[in-house]
Design a protein with these regions (language model features):
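C-terminal cap of thioredoxin/glutaredoxin-like
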Residues: 45, 51-143, 151-153, 159, ...
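Short, surface-exposed acidic/glycine-rich loop or hinge patches that mediate macromolecular interfaces
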Residues: 157-161, 227
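Extended cationic-aromatic binding surfaces that line active-site or macromolecule-binding grooves
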Residues: 150-152, 160-161, 180, 188
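Structural alpha/beta surface segment adjacent to cysteine/selenocysteine redox centers
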Residues: 1-58, 166-238
């Protein structure tokens, strides 16, 4: 289910950043992924063009074209060692997933966090021209707002800092567009038996802090409400 949601999410987000993502309903198979990994490793000093080209071929399910890019197929041990070393580097950087950009100790996961990186680079005076930002999300400001009788189901967790951050923005959205919010409380991940790594907890906290600062939302001095506090909070909705 998570993989399918990720595919749909990528497809919906891409146009807002003037990008394209193929209409696919399944992930590339293991053999194709392995071939793409071999192609990347065999090229040595990778460039962004290499990554884009191999990525396009991967999602197009074009195994033969990927194979043609490999002059000498690396052995399984070489590929496994490279993946292991990179996984260790990712852990040292303080993250736990792919699609992560790291600059001076700060992680940026996914395209929607790249504007934060660009903002940081601009503050350092590294922008070389007066052109528009590289990473811009398209949006339309609707002036004539009509009450369309829409509803949004909000899956809300008392322990999730993202749920906390969303409350202010969702409230503003509801007032501006006449949207009804249906809050549906869910148990925190840990209380559902899921394991949350130190890297994940740390990244989420740091990420929420910068998003909170960006939207003028107080965030800090955290006391974990896990357990009894969450249960007491949810009892209000019983």
């Amino acid at each position: 289910m998570l993989a399918l949601i990720g595919l749909k999410d990528a497809n919906m987000i891409a146009p807002h950043y003037s990008l394209k993502f193929p209409l696919v309903n399944h992930l590339p198979n293991h053999e194709l992924i392995r071939m793409a990994q071999s192609a990347l490793i065999s090229r040595g000093n990778l460039t962004s063009k290499d990554l884009i080209k191999i990525g396009d071929l991967l999602w197009a399910n074009d195994q033969s074209s990927i194979e043609n890019m490999i002059s000498s197929i690396p052995g399984d041990e070489v590929v496994d060692n490279a993946l292991s070393l990179n996984a260790e580097s990712r852990k040292k950087f303080g993250h736990y997933l792919g699609g992560v950009f790291v600059y001076e100790g700060e992680c940026y996961w996914g395209i929607d966090r790249l504007p934060l990186l660009e903002k940081r680079l601009k503050k350092l005076g590294l922008k070389t021209n007066d052109g528009p930002n590289v990473v811009q999300r398209k949006h339309n400001d609707i002036k004539d707002i009509k009450n369309l009788d829409l509803e949004i189901d909000v899956l809300w967790s008392a322990r999730s800092p993202y749920s906390y951050l969303a409350m202010k923005l969702l409230s503003e959205l509801s007032k501006k567009y006449g949207v009804k919010l249906n809050y549906k409380i869910i148990l925190p991940m840990v209380m559902r038996g899921m394991k949350v790594s130190l890297e994940k907890r740390t990244y989420i906290t740091k990420d929420c802090k910068r998003i909170a600062d960006q939207n003028d939302i107080p965030f800090g001095n955290i006391i974990d409400p896990l357990g009894y506090a969450v249960e007491r909070c949810y009892s209000l909705y019983a």
